[in-house]
Regions:
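A metal-dependent hydrolase signature that marks the N-terminal structural subdomain at the beginning
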Residues: 1-40, 145, 149
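Second-shell loop/turn segments in exported
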Residues: 6-11, 65-68, 97-99
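Active-site scaffold of zinc-dependent metalloenzymes
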Residues: 34-75, 85-89
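Extracytoplasmic/secreted proteins, especially bacterial periplasmic and envelope-associated proteins
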Residues: 73, 77, 103, 107-111
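Catalytic Zn2+-binding segment of zinc metalloproteases
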Residues: 82-99
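Active-site catalytic microenvironments for nucleophilic, acid-base chemistry
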Residues: 85, 89, 111-118
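Long, well-structured alpha-helical subdomains associated
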Residues: 101, 113-150
Length: 150
């Protein structure tokens, strides 16, 4: 997630709420939600493919930014990370280099928008995030293409 999201470590109540959301999304049937570092400021919510776990971080909470990713609720954020895990289980290996990492992020947000228990506002934010990620991919791919031609 982006730095325009929350950076303050989560309280025990917020962590418990996220654990309940994870169960609601049926994430516990896919992989473990690791909460041990979520109380640390600046911690990141992310799927770790090597360990097949989602780490809960401070940035699971929305921030003050105007971008859809900044405004995503805990449900949308966790659904996005769960979709990375589900896609990994389907055999989709995540790219780590630009520009393709942007497409992976777009696909994860679109996939997450179809998960059960994701409401309309969250769905819109996830779709808007996917659009933004595709635009970032287009810019990065064009830059890479221009560099290769030089």
């Amino acid at each position: 997630m982006l730095s325009s999201r929350n950076q303050t470590g989560l309280t025990s109540w917020e962590i418990e709420r996220c654990e309940q959301i994870w169960v609601l999304l049926e994430g516990d049937g896919c992989c473990e939600l690791v909460t041990s570092g979520a109380d640390r400021s600046g911690s990141r919510t992310r799927f770790n493919q090597g360990q097949n776990v989602v780490f809960l971080g401070a940035d699971v909470l929305p921030g003050n930014g105007v971008h859809a990713r900044s405004q995503m609720s805990e449900i949308a954020c966790l659904a996005h990370e769960l979709s990375h895990a589900q896609r990994f289980r389907m055999g989709i290996d995540r790219p780590v280099d630009q520009p393709d990492v942007f497409l992976d992020e777009a696909e994860a947000s679109l996939h997450a928008s179809f998960l059960g228990n994701v409401g309309l506002v969250d769905r819109r934010n996830l779709v808007e995030d996917a659009r933004f990620q595709i635009a970032e991919w287009q810019k990065a791919a064009t830059n890479q293409e221009n560099e290769n031609e030089s």
